[in-house]
Amino acid sequence: MMRKLAILSVSSFLFVEALFQEYQCYGSSSNTRVLNELNYDNAGTNLYNELEMNYYGKQENWYSLKKNSRSLGENDDADNGDADNGDEGIDENRRHRNKEGKEKLKKPKHNKLKQPGNDNVDPNANPNVDPNANPNVDPNANPNVDPNANPNVDPNANPNVNPNANPNVDPNANPNVNPNANPNVNPNANPNVNPNANPNANPNANPNANPNANPNANPNANPNANPNANPNANPNANPNANPNANPNANPNANPNANPNANPNRNNEANGQGHNKPNDQNRNVNENANANNAGRNNNNEEPSDKHIEEFLKQIQNNLSTEWSPCSVTCGNGIQVRIKPGSAGKPKDQLDYENDLEKKICKMEKCSSVFNVVNSSIGLIMVLSFLFLN
């Protein structure tokens, strides 16, 4: 209850204070100031005496605003002809003063000191005439003569001299120079040129010839050497290569041949055996022995028959990506289509030219133990999920 009364009393006090702000006075806090400002308009004739203001505390109240104006030069006497018509008299006086000021500005300035000299001076004469100038100057002389010109010029000199001539001409130069000589002579040309050089040299000679070429080259060398020879030939190649080697080697040989292949295989040593993978006359005992040697660990290289069967299985799935390994344990093969042959129909792909092959090796082979182990683990996981 007391709280409500306190709030009501405070709000009533504030309401009453807001209604009667004009009658508040704070004793010594009142401050009165009178401003007397003199202000002239643009013509400089009207004087203002204004702005009398009173201030009370924080509230600013203007109780009076006095504005008195009078005209400067105004006379209350009856003799003044402008007394009855103040504004018209002011305008007339103002125009008269402005007219007198303009006339004063227009008056020419005269030199009060009399200057001796010719009274008929040319008004267009040059005021900066040289007092030491030659009085006998040729009136027809060139006004644009170079002041730094040579005073000892030859009077018989050629008047048509080339203005762009070389000023540094050799005075001892040959006067009988060939007028048809090449003006673009190489300034860096060799001054020690052989005077007996061949004048019919090949104009199409190679300008980038090797300056360190062998001067003792074989003069009987083949002039029709292969222009497409490999420029990156091995500089350390065997100089004792077989001169009777087969010049018709297979250009489509596999560039990815196994570098660790066995050099003692029967079908490769001494050029014996058959090289075709599908040759029906292949030594059957050779393949049989190879299969029997690695039957237990399944680590033998994939045979041609295995590769052919694998290609038939994945023929419809071949792409430019490597296929999965053909085996799950041991050595197998992966196949993909070469990027350049990707647009060919799959039934027209060539085994040698359109397919890439590589050997893959599966290290971890599946066994019965692995299958049982995986089954037990799966059962344990399922039982844990469903029983809980």
Curated annotation (Swiss-Prot):
Region Disordered: start-end pairs: 71-302
Stretches for region Required for the binding to heparan sulfate proteoglycans (HSPGs) on the surface of host hepatocytes: 104-111
Name of a matching Pfam family: TSP_1
Sequence ranges of Acidic residues compositional bias: 74-90
Domain annotation TSP type-1: ranges: 313-366
Function: Essential sporozoite protein. In the mosquito vector, required for sporozoite development in the oocyst, migration through the vector hemolymph and entry into the vector salivary glands. In the vertebrate host, required for sporozoite migration through the host dermis and infection of host hepatocytes. Binds to highly sulfated heparan sulfate proteoglycans (HSPGs) on the surface of host hepatocytes.
Membership in a protein family: Belongs to the plasmodium circumsporozoite protein family.
Protein name: Circumsporozoite protein
Organism, as annotated: Plasmodium reichenowi
